[in-house]
Regions:
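C-terminal beta-strand-loop-alpha-helix "lid" module of Rossmann-like NAD(P)-dependent dehydrogenases
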Residues: 1-267
């Protein structure tokens, strides 16, 4: 009987310790969530301003591309536009790229399973052959998942910090843009959990490349003029890749925010 009481006391003590550890982990996750939410809001302000500037700078190229698509001609001017702003140019899709963002570890509730389940359904619905798509993975859970199923994993990155910086993930975003530019895939979707609030996230598959979120009609709403040196083409060749990189980084920030929220509620 004494031994039985001792066992009960040990279980009670063990349960209390587990509760203390879980509470501490929840507090840490909550602090990280608060920090990254503040940073994500600041980044959104920056991203919106960059988008506005890029839209103004690329307005001429966007109009020429639209006119070229409507007339369906192969003029010399059209090739000039494509060479200057290739990231804007839609091309026949022979292969689709998917950049899938998951966590490196568990204890995040259904965060990873939601993304991976939705991804497998997308592949099943949209592709008949494994040759039609290529995978890129941010996070060990996703990378291991795709490898275990024999999917074409062209790139993986593990160990993104809890509060990522652009310098930290520069390799990821530059690799994605370079692979698109080199024709490894003809369009890129970034797939992740979008942070709605602490209790809710929603799966997103956003088309990032070619750049398609620039609306020329917005230019008419402002009277801003830019002084450009040395010339517009040179500036666009530098700015457009950076803008594409900023879109991908924004998705990584959003996904990381959703991860911390999931970790907080899972405790």
């Amino acid at each position: 009987m004494a031994e039985s009481l001792m066992d009960i006391k040990r279980k009670i003590a063990s349960t209390k310790k587990t509760g203390q550890i879980t509470q501490a982990m929840q507090m840490v996750s909550g602090a990280k969530l608060s920090q990254i939410e503040k940073r994500a809001k600041k980044y959104q302000i920056y991203s919106d301003k960059v988008r506005q500037i890029v839209t103004h700078l690329a307005a001429g190229q966007l109009l020429e591309l639209a006119n070229a698509a409507e007339s369906d001609t192969d003029s010399g001017d059209k090739s000039q536009v494509i060479s200057v702003a290739s990231l804007l140019q839609k091309r026949p899709v022979k292969k689709t790229g998917y950049l899938v963002i998951t966590s490196d570890r568990g204890l995040v509730g259904s965060y990873n399973s939601t993304v991976l389940k939705a991804m497998m359904q997308m592949i099943k619905d949209d592709h008949e052959s494994p040759d039609d798509y290529v995978m890129m993975a941010i996070g060990g859970v996703g990378a291991d998942f795709f490898k275990a199923r024999g999917l074409n994993l062209a790139y993986e990155y593990r160990g993104v910090s809890d509060i990522p910086t652009f310098n930290e993930v520069r390799e990821i975003v530059k690799t994605a843009v370079t692979m698109f530019d080199n024709g490894v895939f003809d369009e890129l979707y970034v797939c992740y959990n979008h942070h709605v609030n602490t209790l809710t996230s929603a799966f997103r598959a956003e088309k990032m490349l070619p750049i398609s979120d620039l609306d020329v009609s917005e230019v008419a709403d402002t009277n801003v003029e830019y002084l450009i040196e040395p010339d517009l083409d040179s500036v666009l060749e530098s700015v457009l890749p950076q803008y594409a990189e900023s879109l991908i980084f924004g998705a990584i920030m959003d996904a990381k925010t959703a991860e911390h929220a999931a970790s907080t509620t899972a405790m």
